[in-house]
Structure formats: C-alpha cells, structure tokens
Amino acid sequence: MAKKSKIAKDRKQRVLVLKYASLRSELKKKADYVGLSQIPAKASPVRLKNRDSIDGRPRGYIRKFGISRIKFRQLAHEGKLPGVKKTSW
C-alpha cells in the first residue's frame, strides 16, 4: 500500500484538474497561451499519474476499473466486481 500522503496528494491533484478543466479548454480554444500560463501547472491532466483508487498503488493499473491488478484479482475472487468472472481456456 502506498503512503497515505501519496494517496491524499493524488486525490487533491484530481480535484484541481477537475476545477480548472473547463477554463483550460476555453483558453485552449482561444489559443490564449498567456492565460494558460496563469493556471497552476498541476492542473494539467497530463501530469496525473494513474493510481489505484483503493490503496494508491502506482503500477499495474487497470483503467477500466480504476484499481491495480492485485486489488482487481482480490475483489474478483470475492465476487465484488459485477460482471467479472474467472475464465479458463
């Protein structure tokens, strides 16, 4: 599990990105690069790191579910992910 400070930092940054999303898109349409430079750099969605929403693990992230492969496996075995079942071939 990642440090609690990393998890909190990630959540805080995601809120910041959502806060400035509409303003960023308007400024980009107008090509107002001076205005864009006034917005905090951390408000850019490119700077976000995909992290597990449960325990903050930065690697092995599955986008569709928003969790890491380890948590995905654990929750799938417990039957807590709707529509997910173990397959065999």
Curated annotation (Swiss-Prot):
Listed InterPro entries: Ribosomal_uS14, Ribosomal_uS14_bac/plastid, Ribosomal_uS14_sf
Tagged with keyword rRNA-binding: yes
GO biological process: translation
Any one annotated GO CC term: small ribosomal subunit
Recorded GO MF terms: rRNA binding; structural constituent of ribosome
Superkingdom field: Bacteria
Keyword Isomerase set for record: no
SUPFAM superfamilies, alphabetized: Glucocorticoid receptor-like (DNA-binding domain) (SSF57716)
Keywords: Ribonucleoprotein, Ribosomal protein, RNA-binding, rRNA-binding
Subunit structure: Part of the 30S ribosomal subunit. Contacts proteins S3 and S10.
Function (record text): Binds 16S rRNA, required for the assembly of 30S particles and may also be responsible for determining the conformation of the 16S rRNA at the A site.
Family: Belongs to the universal ribosomal protein uS14 family.
Listed name of the protein: Small ribosomal subunit protein uS14
